[in-house]
């Protein structure tokens, strides 16, 4: 037969309270974890919103170079594409209307900011300048992540030139202005 604890032991076990020292240690542990986790989470969440313009411009640059490799310099890049969508979403991400990305340049590049029906936070543009011996392009992403009316700008450039042994290329670096707007 199993022995039973005396009645007074059972009531003490059920009513056990934490000492002030145990509470202080627990509070310190929770505070330490929060002090590490919260800033990291906020930083990563913010950085994830900046992936869209960087990734989008890299895809445009790659498509522009691939396009130029198959054409003479005078027609190395397609015609300029206006800011698409024409007004960047303000303070939130939005899905596009059905035909938003139907401009011939976006079709040539097989580019959309996000999959059909998925919201995105940036608008993109592509400008090309074609000459007989040199052609250049500028691709931009504009967004207003905090909704205050001020826009952030991300920009890459590229070129194709007659006699350039490297061929068409995206220029090194990315111009960024007001990245957290």
Regions found by a protein language model. Name each.
Residues 122-132:
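Short amphipathic beta-strand and strand-loop transition segments with alternating hydrophobic
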Residues 1-18:
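N-terminal leader/signal peptides at the extreme start of proteins
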Residues 13-45:
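N-terminal single-pass transmembrane signal-anchor helix
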Residues 51-59, 64-113:
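Short, glycine/small-hydrophobic-rich surface segments
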Residues 144-151:
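Acidic, glycine-anchored loop motifs typical of Ca2+
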Residues 151-181:
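Low-complexity, S/T/G/P-rich flexible repeat/linker segments used as non-globular hinges
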């Amino acid at each position: 037969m199993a022995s039973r604890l005396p009645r007074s032991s059972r009531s003490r076990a059920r009513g056990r309270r934490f000492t002030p020292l145990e509470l202080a240690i627990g509070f310190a542990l929770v505070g330490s974890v929060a002090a590490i986790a919260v800033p990291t989470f906020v930083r990563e969440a913010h950085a994830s919103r900046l992936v869209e313009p960087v990734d989008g411009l890299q895809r445009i640059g790659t498509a522009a170079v691939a396009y130029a490799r198959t054409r003479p310099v005078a027609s190395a890049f397609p015609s300029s594409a206006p800011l698409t969508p024409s007004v960047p979403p303000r303070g939130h991400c939005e899905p596009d209307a059905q035909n938003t990305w139907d401009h011939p340049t976006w079709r040539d590049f097989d580019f959309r900011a996000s999959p059909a029906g998925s919201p995105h936070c940036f608008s993109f543009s592509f400008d090309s300048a074609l000459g007989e011996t040199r052609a250049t392009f500028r691709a931009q992403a504009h967004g207003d992540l905090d909704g205050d009316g001020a826009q952030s700008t991300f920009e890459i450039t590229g070129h194709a030139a007659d006699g350039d042994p490297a061929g068409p290329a995206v220029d090194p670096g990315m111009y960024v202005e007001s990245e957290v707007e």
